[in-house]
Design a protein with these regions (language model features):
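Surface-exposed amphipathic alpha-helical tracts and adjacent flexible/coil segments at the periphery
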Residues: 1-22, 26-29, 33, 52, ...
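Conserved phosphotransfer cores of two-component systems
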Residues: 108
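Alpha-helix capping and helix-loop boundary segments enriched in small/acidic/polar residues
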Residues: 39, 118-121, 140, 224
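Alpha-helix capping/helix-boundary segments
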Residues: 99-100
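Short beta-strand elements of ligand-binding domains
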Residues: 64-66, 95, 115-117
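Glycine-rich, positively charged N-terminal anion/phosphate-binding segment
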Residues: 37-54
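Gly/Gly-Pro- and Ser/Thr-rich, intrinsically disordered tail segments characteristic of DNA damage-repair
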Residues: 76, 111, 115-122
């Protein structure tokens, strides 16, 4: 049985390293053009070259987004861009638009192409269509039931790979093809600049009574009528693998290293546990509890088990649940002195109790008894952005381990 791929996002080089350290098999990222995430830092061509070498040295793959829905003017420079990515050795391009697909085929005929979920693929005939044109993989629309995905895979066999989203934010528009942002703010979601108006709060107003709000709200601040819960399929890894899915995709190129480390680690552990003993695999509830320790909305299984309904939305507000704070990330650990060098992410004091975790292991508790700055002077608090501080940790850790603290607010 070919092992399912865990595909993770990377908004910058540090996040890419985190994704690899915590178990991603492949990483998807955007360049400075033609992608759908303007909010992430994205990668220069030099960065993509470095990332490709870094990933290939570790047996991982790199997929680059080319998934805008372009107008004529937006195609300027795309041929040279494709050529550069091909020469660098990028493993695949993620494409949504048929014109962009044909342009890739024209410039680099053997460049592997993955069809983005923005392509709105919902049936087996469309999968066959893309396969005949030469696509290597199709990312299925999020509106499909898991049984539909399994049936499609059964019919197309190994002629083309099928990818689905497994975790992350959900768009209320069909496969992400939203015009609300463009209409309301002038920011085009199909060009990577979504303002997320689906998360705004709304009230009903009658046109002849401006300023008079009708009392239909679930919350005193308004009605959140399009505010989807986040997708989370950690409880159903076995069913997704057994459906024949080739790749599970995690959303979140603008998320933090802490978010990526936590989510990727949990899915990696679930996937590995399944393949270690498929017949006796049992879902581990602690993995979901770990995922709940990062910033998130309430969770849903989306459309995988039927039509999304009122339980798939958050009506009360548009805020995230933040049960834990990201304290810092380990830059170095001296095994002789047991001194860990940490880069701070949130203010932390001597005397606080924190949790520490790393790739493939359960977290452990730790109380900060003493803290030094980067010049080995004793301090009581690390309160400057990305401040370097040192603490002694007897339990062996490594570079890339994460420190977090329960948020009591």
């Amino acid at each position: 049985m070919k092992k399912i791929e865990l595909l993770a996002p990377a908004g910058d080089i540090n996040k890419l390293k985190t994704a690899v350290e915590y178990g991603a098999d492949a990483v998807y990222l955007g360049g400075e053009s033609f992608g759908l995430r303007k909010a992430s830092k994205n990668f220069s061509m030099e960065d993509i070259k470095w990332a490709t070498d870094y990933l290939h040295e570790r047996g991982k793959k790199i997929h680059v987004t080319l998934n805008i829905i372009p107008h004529n003017d937006d195609m300027e420079g795309v041929e040279e861009y494709i050529k550069e990515l091909y020469e660098i050795g990028v493993d695949a391009l993620i494409v949504a638009d048929p014109g962009m697909f044909m342009k890739v085929k024209e410039v680099a005929p053997d460049f592997p192409i993955h069809i983005s979920t923005q392509g709105s693929v919902t049936n087996v005939e469309t999968v066959k269509f893309w396969q005949k044109l030469g696509a290597e993989r199709v990312g299925m629309a999020r509106e499909l039931r898991l049984k539909e995905v399994a049936d499609i895979i059964k019919e197309v066999g190994d002629t083309i790979e099928v990818e689905t989203f497994a975790h992350g934010a959900m768009c209320m528009s069909y496969s992400g093809r939203c015009l609300l942002s463009n209409y309301m703010t002038g920011r085009d979601a199909n060009m990577g600049d979504c303002a997320q108006p689906c998360r705004y709060k709304y009230n009903l107003v009658e046109e002849k009574r401006p300023g008079e709000y009708f009392p239909i709200e679930e919350h005193e601040e308004g009605t959140f009528i399009m505010n989807s819960k986040d997708l989370c399929m950690i409880e159903h890894i076995d069913e997704m693998i057994e459906a024949g899915i080739a790749s599970l995709k995690i959303e979140g190129r603008v998320k933090s290293e802490y978010y990526l480390a936590t989510v990727i680690r949990s899915y990696r552990m679930a996937i590995d546990a399944y393949y270690a003993d498929p017949e006796n695999y049992k879902y581990d509830p602690s993995l979901l509890e770990e995922i709940k320790k990062v910033s998130h909305r309430d969770f849903t299984t989306g459309f995988f088990y039927g039509q999304a309904n009122e339980d798939s939305q958050v009506y009360e507000d548009n805020s995230y649940i933040r049960g834990y704070d990201f304290v810092g990330i380990v830059l170095d650990y001296d095994e002789e002195t047991k001194i860990a060098t940490i880069e701070q992410r949130n203010r932390v004091f001597v005397g606080e109790e924190i949790e520490i975790f790393g790739p493939g292991i359960k977290h452990f508790d730790y109380k900060i008894e003493k803290m030094l700055d980067d010049k080995d002077r004793e301090i009581d608090v690390a309160n400057k952005a990305k401040q370097i501080f040192k603490i002694k940790i007897e339990e062996p850790i490594k570079k890339g381990f994460i420190l977090r603290r329960e948020n009591e607010e």
